[in-house]
């Protein structure tokens, strides 16, 4: 059984070679047997000869692979004694070494982990508990307090409070929690649970490991079900693509386990490859954006990866010099990067002695991270790059699914062995997410607007859902506005949101200027005039808001939902 599409032919919806499909040229074929292994087994086998290598750095402590795997084994024995079996789902709301050992333990016994994020509100949490027979939740005390306001946590058999500030190997003591709830125990008490049954390792990789929420901009969180094989496939893709990730390299986990890229690209896959993951804690009294770079410098991190919005925030929060001379690879993920952002980030990297320039990558939560990578032959350094091995693209009309010629903008479809299995308990959304071509191959609908050239270089223009439908039925996309505004010397960044004005559809612009001291009204008028004179914008914005930053979600991206909900501070234009 093959899960691969890397045959020497075009994979496309149409039959003409002029259409925007990618020819796959991989030497090897990624087959079923290559990914039919659990993440736990891959990490154990991959580091068997290097047990004292450092797996995690957390709160100043270095945790070896031997320590991490030993705790994962202990946790899996305890979960088995608690009658947790293959196919069961537990809840996890933490980003710490304990959380990593829990992920590995569940991979060992075939259980799945539903990862809680800030986008999972108490009502959604209560619905999750009502819909699923979840026996146990692991979380920090603040996450527990957030959900304990309702009665849902009382329905769980156990709630285990994880010590945020203690790494593996420490003598953990109970943290403060509501001792009146008999189902709440400390991590120390959990580790002392009497083992009555030793865990049996579940073989294979085709069972659920994570259920995570999308951190994109397409609405409420969705339960994205990822199997073990998806993480294994991503590791093989990185090796085949020639990523220079070597044993002992330190990768900075700027994104938490609550984010798909944080769990896959910046945590589990590096552990499979024998890297060291720097888990950066977010202290409440410290600017986290500055601390990311401080930690990277102090621990001499070699690999940095973050969305453009997070890069800008880190740089803005760190005006003084920071030694990045150990950094050999730098990536941008999660959002398109503008030329201004690219120049700003690269200027910072160069001035602080990083050994590489920013390399853009593209992907989505539903494919477990990335589908493209930057190569030196790209026409544009801010493009999404070319397809990684075992992955291909096609550009289609969003409404008709008709395949489009090279260079024409349409929806991006992806074929990849890392794709999710389904949206949890949502067969309708799952069916709409996948499309099969004439060869029976399954493609993922991204909802992103993009173009593909004949060399296979992909350009992402934005989310299709962010387009504005003008009164005459024509579309105005954010990239059309950006193509005008980002050429203005006064504008650094810009986002467009749909609004309702006087009962009719309209759109507003959020703009970050290069000079925050410039008169806002004058700048708004300059922007309006530039759009009016461009000739390409047939329907002009009603409002502009000048601001110094954008809100970000847990994935580090611009939170478009929050922008759309803002109602004050706008300058009316028409």
Language model region names:
Residues 64-66, 201, 209-233:
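Conserved AMP-binding A3 loop
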Residues 161, 178-213, 220, 243-250:
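Conserved pre-ATP/AMP-binding loop-to-beta segment of ANL
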Residues 69-77, 190-192, 205, 224-246, ...:
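Conserved structural elements of the adenylate-forming
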Residues 61, 77-120, 253-257:
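Conserved AMP-binding/adenylate-forming
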Residues 468, 495-500, 508-510, 528-574:
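Conserved C-terminal "lid"/linker of ANL adenylate-forming enzymes
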Residues 413-478, 487:
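Conserved ATP-binding/catalytic segment of the ANL
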Residues 302-305, 315-380, 392:
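Gly/Ser/Thr-rich phosphate-binding loop
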Residues 232-250, 258-302, 317:
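Conserved AMP-binding/adenylation subdomain of ANL enzymes
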């Amino acid at each position: 059984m093959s899960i691969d599409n890397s045959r020497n032919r075009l994979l496309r919806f149409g039959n003409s070679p002029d259409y925007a499909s990618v020819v796959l040229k991989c030497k090897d074929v990624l087959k079923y047997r290559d990914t039919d292994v659990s993440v736990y087994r891959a990490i154990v086998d991959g580091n068997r000869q290097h047990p004292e290598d450092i797996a995690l750095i957390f709160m100043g402590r270095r945790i070896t692979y031997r320590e991490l795997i030993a705790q994962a084994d202990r946790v899996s024995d305890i979960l088995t004694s608690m009658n947790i079996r293959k196919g069961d789902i537990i809840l996890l709301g933490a980003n710490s070494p304990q959380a990593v050992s829990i992920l590995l333990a569940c991979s060992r016994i075939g259980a799945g982990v539903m990862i809680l994020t800030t986008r999972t509100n108490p009502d959604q949490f209560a619905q999750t508990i009502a819909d699923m027979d979840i026996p146990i939740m692991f979380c920090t005390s603040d996450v527990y307090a957030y959900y304990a306001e309702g009665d849902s946590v009382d329905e769980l058999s156990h709630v285990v409070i994880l010590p945020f500030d203690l790494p593996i190997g420490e003598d953990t003591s109970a943290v403060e929690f509501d001792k009146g709830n008999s189902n709440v125990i400390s991590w120390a008490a959990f580790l002392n649970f009497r083992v009555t049954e030793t865990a049996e390792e579940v073989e294979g990789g085709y069972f659920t490991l994570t259920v995570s929420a999308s951190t994109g901009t397409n609405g409420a969180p969705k339960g994205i079900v990822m199997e073990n094989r998806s993480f294994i496939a991503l590791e093989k893709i990185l090796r085949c693509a020639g990523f220079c990730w070597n044993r002992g390299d330190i990768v900075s986990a700027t994104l938490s386990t609550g984010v798909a890229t944080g769990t896959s690209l910046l945590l589990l896959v590096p552990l499979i490859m024998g890297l060291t993951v720097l888990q950066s804690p977010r202290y409440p009294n410290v600017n986290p954006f500055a601390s990311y770079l401080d930690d990277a410098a102090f621990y001499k991190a070699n690999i940095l990866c973050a969305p453009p919005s997070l890069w800008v925030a880190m740089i803005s929060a760190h005006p003084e010099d920071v030694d990045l001379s150990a950094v050999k690879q730098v990536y941008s993920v999660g959002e398109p990067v503008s030329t201004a952002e690219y120049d700003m980030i690269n200027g910072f990297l160069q001035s602080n002695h990083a050994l590489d320039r920013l390399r853009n990558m593209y992907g989505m939560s539903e494919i477990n991270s990335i589908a493209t990578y930057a190569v030196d032959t790209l026409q544009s350094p801010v493009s999404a790059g070319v397809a990684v091995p075992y992955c291909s693209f096609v550009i289609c009309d969003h409404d008709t699914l008709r395949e489009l010629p090279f260079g024409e903008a349409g929806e991006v479809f992806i074929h990849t062995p890392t794709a999710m299995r389904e949206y949890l308990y949502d067969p309708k959304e799952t069916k709409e997410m996948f499309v099969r071509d004439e060869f029976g191959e399954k493609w993922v609908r991204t909802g992103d607007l993009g173009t593909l050239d004949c060399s296979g270089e992909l350009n992402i223009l934005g989310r299709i859902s962010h387009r504005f439908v003008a009164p005459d039925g024509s579309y105005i996309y954010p990239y059309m506005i950006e193509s005008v505004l980002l050429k203005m010397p006064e504008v650094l960044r810009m986002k467009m949101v749909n609004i309702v004005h006087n009962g009719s559809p309209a759109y507003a612009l959020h703009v970050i200027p290069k000079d925050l001291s410039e008169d806002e009204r004058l700048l708004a008028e300059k922007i309006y005039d530039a759009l009016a004179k461009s000739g390409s914008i047939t329907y002009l914005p009603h409002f502009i808001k000048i601001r110094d930053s954008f809100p970000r979600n847990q994935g580090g991206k611009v939170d478009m939902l929050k922008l759309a909900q803002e109602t004050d501070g706008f300058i009316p234009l028409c």
